[in-house]
Amino acid sequence: MLLADTWYPNWWQALILGMVQGITEFLPISSTAHLRVFPALVGWPDAGASFTAVIQLGSLGAVLIYFASDLRQLILGSWKAWRERDFQQEPWRLSVGILVGTVPIVVAGWAIKAIWGSPPRQLWVIATAAIGLAVLLGWAEQTGKRQRDLHSLGIWDGIWVGLAQALSLIPGVSRSGSTLTAGLFLHLQRSAAARYSFLLGIPALFLAGVVEFISEFEAEALLPQGLGTLSAFVFSYLSIDWLIQFLQRSSTWLFIVYRIGFGLFIILGLALGFLRP
């Protein structure tokens, strides 16, 4: 059950939080961080990790629809590879890479929930993570050769990107940011790294949303969760489409600079007192 002091946003607050979730989930800037900082700026309570995880199901729905064709090819191609016992086929390698790449975040998420209940959401943690990942993304942007596409990916690539995805349990890191960074380090093209990040995120988003919805179920939360999820779906779809097109023609430096500025803004807010830890 939810804690007695859990805050439930009203209908328009839920729509706004869903919009924030949708816009920021797939951009490498951390949706969790923005869902923590935005309410603090406008004077709302923190909706909590459970609300954040549940409305991510809207982002999941957007991925499933946007990449429906890719997913259909992966499923049918993997089934064909299984029947033919040809495990070098591309759909099989991609599918297995996604599955094994999900293991690290599942294990880490279970451990965090068992030990601490939820990840830390203090603003100083978010600021540190935002700047730290920006440095890594900048390094990857500079050193990555960007020669590989999705056709070259194998199971080991899924493992490495999956390990990076587990770091996103730290608020401020960003799941898309950590996986995009890992993809660039593996010399993927920017748009290919983003597409793989989206596909890899499907199991993680599903498991996080369903687990939190079931374990923290409260009838009073259904309306805000539903509205937030719907809003997140719409804005996630638009965000995915924009990012794929953006990375086909531009670098990630826009997000690197934004992350550093975002982290410094939080630090300034904490120092001046207009943000509470």
Swiss-Prot record:
It is found in: Cell inner membrane. It comes from Synechococcus sp. (strain JA-2-3B'a(2-13)) (Cyanobacteria bacterium Yellowstone B-Prime). Keywords: Antibiotic resistance, Cell inner membrane, Cell membrane, Cell shape, Cell wall biogenesis/degradation, Hydrolase, Membrane, Peptidoglycan synthesis, Transmembrane, Transmembrane helix. This is Undecaprenyl-diphosphatase. Catalyzes the dephosphorylation of undecaprenyl diphosphate (UPP). Confers resistance to bacitracin. The chain crosses the membrane at residues 11-31, 47-67, 96-116, 123-143, 153-173, 197-217, 227-247, 254-274. Its main location: membrane. Belongs to the UppP family. Bacitracin is thought to be involved in the inhibition of peptidoglycan synthesis by sequestering undecaprenyl diphosphate, thereby reducing the pool of lipid carrier available. GO terms for cellular component: plasma membrane.
